[in-house]
């Protein structure tokens, strides 16, 4: 019964998501799963071969690039519930095959979209939870009613690491990451370093 409930919950989430995006004027689209370039995210792709064209192709890691083409082509609001594939590790945050929703809304700035997504989560939770915005997990009761607390990326890292990022060199960041036992790759740029440190400390 528990597994059956999970399938039902997933179906409800998809229906409610479509309702929310459609009523806001979004167009749902399908973009190619087989792609000639593995783009849209920094991730290891699955590689396959197209026999008729005799070329290697990739299962998409994200729908981003095709959705952005639609924005450039004049579609101001697009979204996709995309099946994506990443040939990486498996843990509580990673699965090689997964569904994600990706959406673009032209001419809207990030603070508007943050508030709009808060309303989406509130709508979603109410829809699956008999009108209640509160959900109990193993430890806490989480209330999805907005507004949500805002956390500034730089301020949060400055506080967690007890440094000023504006005055911290890339080499110093690498040293901090190594001290934290992060498996630092020499190809990592400053952005990747900051992202990994954020995941570890914030």
Regions found by a protein language model. Give the residues of each.
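Class II aminoacyl-tRNA synthetase-like tRNA-binding/catalytic domains
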Residues: 1-112, 122, 199
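Generic recognition of short, well-ordered alpha-helical interface segments
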Residues: 12, 112-115, 151, 168
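Metal-assisted phosphate- and nucleotidyl-transfer catalytic regions
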Residues: 39-45, 123-202
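Short amphipathic alpha-helices in soluble, non-transmembrane regions
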Residues: 118-119
């Amino acid at each position: 019964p528990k597994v059956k409930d999970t399938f039902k919950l997933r179906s409800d989430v998809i229906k409610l998501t479509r309702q929310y995006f459609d009523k806001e004027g979004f167009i749902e689209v399908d973009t190619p799963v087989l792609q000639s370039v593995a783009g849209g995210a920094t991730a290891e792709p699955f590689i396959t071969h197209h026999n008729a064209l005799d070329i290697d192709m990739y299962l998409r890691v994200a729908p981003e690039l095709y959705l952005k083409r639609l924005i450039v082509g004049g579609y101001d609001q697009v979204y996709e519930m995309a099946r994506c594939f990443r040939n990486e590790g498996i843990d509580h945050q990673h699965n090689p095959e997964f569904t994600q929703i990706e959406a673009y809304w032209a001419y809207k700035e990030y603070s508007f979209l943050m508030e709009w997504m808060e309303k989406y989560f509130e709508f979603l939770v109410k829809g699956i939870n008999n009108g209640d915005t509160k959900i109990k997990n193993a430890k806490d009761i989480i209330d999805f009613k907005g507004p949500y607390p805002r956390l500034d990326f730089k301020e949060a890292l400055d506080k967690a690491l007890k440094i000023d990022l504006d005055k911290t060199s890339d080499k110093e960041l690498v040293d901090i990451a190594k001290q934290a036992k992060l498996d630092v790759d020499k190809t990592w740029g400053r952005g990747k370093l900051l992202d990994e440190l954020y995941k570890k400390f914030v």
